[in-house]
Structures are given as structure tokens and as C-alpha cells.
Amino acid sequence: MEAYGIAGHNYVKLRDIGKAVGFNVFWDADSGCVQIETDAPYTGEAPSAEAVPSAAAPSDVDAAKQDIVARTNALRAERGIAALAADDQLMRAAQVRADEMAATGTYSHTRPDGRKYYTVTDCRQVGENIHQIPLLYLAQQKTALAETLVYSWSKSAGHMENMTDESYAAIGVGLARGTDANGMECWYCVQLFLRSGYSISAVDKPATK
């Protein structure tokens, strides 16, 4: 490893250390500084955009939805609260909410056409959690969507209250790919909850602006 003498001190290039030790060092033009990736082998190049996962297969999305339901029920079990049943109509409604947000970029409990979120069903006894997660964040953190979602919701008092509300008996989950306000690819994620003793007989189509 070549050292350089400057003003009586010896210096070694950071990229040479990266090569020798086995971590990546690269110049990040966006931030205007050198970046270090301790968990990646040396290439001298910034990570490519291919690090962001491609569109998930339907089976993967279905598995993520089931995982979200399971993780939510695990939180309830820890508190001695009855599990939520995955309701087909509520699952459809949650997917409509995720789809309409992804299609319009409207990240809100208000639907793209200005109506309240619960108008996606014919029952007002419905609660909603929403989240927007960039794909790049999941790739950088190396965490699964379901794990990240439920953990994030559990750290928010209002979202956690919905997930552990004893008056809710059923759950629906919707996931859709879209872009956020900055143009970054992201997941639009929805949980819908239905109070005990109520049912849904109709689900609306996705709303537009």
C-alpha cells in the first residue's frame, strides 16, 4: 500500500485501504463527497440503480399481505387481544385504496376525488392506516416490506391504536407500487379495520382526481 508524505505526515489513499481491507469507496456526485460501504466489496463505483428491486410478483405481494396480517395479530396477541380475521371484502377495499393512491400519487386518508377513505365500502365503521415506503429505503435497509410496515405503524400512537383496538374484528391489506412526490418508486400501503358486528356488502372502484 503506497503512502504519501505531506508536511511530515504519512497518508494512505482511502480507496487503497478499501481495496486492501475489502470495503467499497466511491465518489457520490449527488452529495459531493466520498462515500463508504462497509458491507460491500470494493468496486470504486456507486451502487447502481439495479439495487432497487423490480416489481414484485403477485404471489410475493399476497405473501406480504398475509405477513402484515400475521404481524398485526402478533401485536394483538402480546396484549391479550383477539386476532383479526382477514376479510375478503375488506382486502378488496384496502387494495382499491392502495391502487388509487398509487395511480394518482395521492397519499392521504382523503380519496383522490375528495371523499373520505371509508367511502371505499358501504360501511362507515372502518378505520384506516396508510404508509408510503420508498423501494430504495427497503433496499438500503435490507428489510422486508411487511416487517418495515408493521414496525413503523407500531411506533406511531394512532396507527398502533388502530392495530390493537379491541372493537375491531376484521382486517384488510392493500399494497400497490407507484411514485412519491419526489418521483421515487415506492409502495403505497393500506390497512383497513372493520368493527365487530358490522359487515361490508359492496366495494367501490378506485377513485380518480
Segments (PLM) and residue ranges:
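Sec-exported extracytoplasmic/periplasmic mature domains
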Residues: 19-23, 73-81, 95-106, 135, ...
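Short, well-ordered surface patches within globular domains
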Residues: 60-119, 166-172, 176-178
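Second-shell loop/turn segments in exported
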Residues: 2-7, 52-63, 77-87, 129-143, ...
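A well-ordered secondary-structure block
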Residues: 116-198
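Extracytoplasmic/secreted proteins, especially bacterial periplasmic and envelope-associated proteins
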Residues: 12-16, 63, 67-74, 85, ...
